[in-house]
């Protein structure tokens, strides 16, 4: 090392959004650890309250502020760091850092960029500069021309020749990018593409239809030494965003010449941008010959590098941080192996498969086709010793109700070959399920290749699974050898039992009798070729012996959160990591079972033992058989653990904390409602939907609107408010499809009520609780609501009643551990709507707001009891904390933005303040694309709900300095109106600074809302929130920028 900075500022990525997720919690946490090892003081700016890194143990100073240049400048001014790390917070961090550089902030305060410099970042992320840099270095790129206007794009597309790929500079998740087959396609979408570029630039590139896409991950130090860490092969061809693609590592279809040529190009790309640290390089390969092009590079930690790190066992983020400090590769020890230096390139004796997870069914009008823009909200990673085993495991990990590639709902559906091929041509999510269906219905390899462009190598493997499964179906009994082969091909007990028309218990019994059990294998980055010490494992049937001996003692298995989806995100990983740390005081050994490559919990130095494998009853029982775990904890990882808790208990597994039977009562809407009646606790009127006659009778008694609520679901899946009979019957039909095993509950929807929650822990007798109040009225899903601590509008009387209700439930259900209760409060009377006997989505926020870790307290409650004398205790608040949702509307092509009882947000941000409005505005500004409107600009304010709030919002915005229009079809008293057509024109012309609306008005204002989000215009979808934010605008000059401890928060 040449020099060691005394204080380093690390820029986080802010709230989770599509294409920028928990991988930056993992990479940022590793960077902070690497800095701490050097004795360097660390300062972190990140508004993502749900992350592990925004805990005090990672950074010396934590600022929960918007990740924008002017807020970061305030931190630099106060903290005076001498170095800044910008490669661990995604595209958000890079954009902010380029702004800080261009505005002279870094130079003014003498802050040195550590790692790849700004000019290298601009060479990589400006499509024009990247193209020029590649050509200067004789590196192959596709025919292309850049453009900064609609006219230039149309002109250059004619030169390049259709079809063209439109790539967007300084951009996240391919937002705004597209394939244009004709000039008409280009004209229709180019304005949106330019709007989504941070610098207003696009690249018009020749579209390489059905070419293979590959990625290489490379490390490079200051001396130019390089190590290529991984080669990742996309199964989806060019034209599908790599974040949307199913991928495998190592590459399966390259010959040595192809592999080595692209490896050499990768090192040359890193050299051309003077990389210091890590980057990924993406290639297009012609499947019909030795022709390849370099597509792009990301000079930072990325989603791919997180995957590569977990796939290989090579700690990319940690090593990258060390290289940024000036170390050379040979000077850094790979802490996963504990034996080798960072210049050793990993060797794999297994196959990793990554599959994205989509939640598109939650969004109306969304384009379901996979394309150049990323729409998936999470991903899973499986490890196996054959492609078939790895792929089938990954399909189960998706938790979409499919038992593997074959044998599930799609495989057994009434669907012809023609229909299956049509779905494949449309590039629907989870295409491998439709490939299997097409083969089952008689399609050939060539027919499927023609519509998909997927390598025949992979198609043959999937066809082999179909053929094997169809053979299984004609057997009456299964012999030992066939069963062994089925397990090696990745078939679950459930799949095998379905094929044989037997029970899963029957299959498990035969396996036990024949000693057909999985073996535990280590991931050591070296394929066992070098002695190593590692705690990173997976299970496979393609092996004969375990790679380790199992210890005895008091051991705990923690079930992780699995792949992220709407409603399950990084907040549950925070709970898992918190539980790991808290449980280590009570157990000899704590192991984690999880399969999400993005997370901190699946990192090499967090868990004593990490099993990177499936989360289901079969796998947990396999692990208990080997490890003899005394307890299994299912309460920290969200819904996936709760959904298997009861079955685990029925199989003799001891659950840590609250019993599976109590969880079942809380999760089953009908059982829970009956319990509330028994305890005399108020709830909205309800009925179990066992027949349409009962539903009609109930609705005649209580009247519309009513809420349709399925059981055992997360994030309000298929939860809808029905205002008419037609809507009601449609929602009931959907709910029974989502949760067919359980009854649907219809309840009276209480209008104009306050929604509030209690996050807490109990020892079965006493409760530690934290009250959260929603800004939006009841009816907006809690995951999409803006939350305040302490409460503002609730009366003390209402809160005391809520506390009494919570205490009654805790004692009746013998709650031991964490829980969350949701209320609607009308006329000072609280009505319970939901109880979750697990860690909640809001628990990181409530814990950090009050300065008390609820998961730590949960462990105390379980083992020692809560250590206070009161029956119910709520810690005091020193200042204000507000949590805001992050939506990803712009990524979800075509969807209609609106709020309701089904969750739509992908992440959350929080901030602290000396007043409610101080905390609210910083929290709201932390979610993209929210910003302070430019004065003298235009705002649109309209809607059919919360009209008084909308009118007051308009008044506040006028005071702030905006010209405010309502819409003549939905006028607000005293506010100037324009017609809908004029409003649409203003939005398209980018003259509107913000849109505030309320209600479900799709037939009326679809174009206004959709165009606004496509053009990065802030949209507020609730009148009450609009009022509070507009009021906060008026106090913009009094925002505070303190470190979290000064607000009395943080843990």
Curated annotation (Swiss-Prot):
Coiled coil: none annotated. Binds 4 Mg(2+) or Mn(2+) ions per subunit. Residues 549-930 are annotated as: Carbamoyl phosphate synthetic domain. Mg(2+) 1 binds at residues 282, 296. Its cofactor is Mg(2+); Mn(2+). Mn(2+) 3 binds at residues 822, 834. Mg(2+) 4 binds at residues 834, 836. Gene3D superfamilies: 3.40.50.20, ATP-grasp fold, A domain, ATP-grasp fold, B domain, Carbamoyl-phosphate synthetase, large subunit oligomerisation domain. Mn(2+) 2 binds at residues 296, 298. It catalyses: hydrogencarbonate + L-glutamine + 2 ATP + H2O = carbamoyl phosphate + L-glutamate + 2 ADP + phosphate + 2 H(+). Residues 400-548 are annotated as: Oligomerization domain. Mg(2+) 2 binds at residues 296, 298. Pathway: Amino-acid biosynthesis; L-arginine biosynthesis; carbamoyl phosphate from bicarbonate: step 1/1; Pyrimidine metabolism; UMP biosynthesis via de novo pathway; (S)-dihydroorotate from bicarbonate: step 1/3. SMART domains: CPSase_L_D3. Mn(2+) 4 binds at residues 834, 836. One of its GO terms (molecular function) is carbamoyl-phosphate synthase (glutamine-hydrolyzing) activity. Residues 930-1051 form the MGS-like domain. Residues 1-399 are annotated as: Carboxyphosphate synthetic domain. Keywords: Amino-acid biosynthesis, Arginine biosynthesis, ATP-binding, Ligase, Magnesium, Manganese, Metal-binding, Nucleotide-binding, Pyrimidine biosynthesis, Repeat. Mg(2+) 3 binds at residues 822, 834. Belongs to the CarB family. Large subunit of the glutamine-dependent carbamoyl phosphate synthetase (CPSase). CPSase catalyzes the formation of carbamoyl phosphate from the ammonia moiety of glutamine, carbonate, and phosphate donated by ATP, constituting the first step of 2 biosynthetic pathways, one leading to arginine and/or urea and the other to pyrimidine nucleotides. NCBIfam families: CPSaseII_lrg, PRK05294.1, PRK12815.1. This is Carbamoyl phosphate synthase large chain. It comes from Saccharolobus islandicus (strain Y.N.15.51 / Yellowstone #2) (Sulfolobus islandicus). The lineage of its organism: Archaea, Thermoproteota, Thermoprotei, Sulfolobales, Sulfolobaceae.
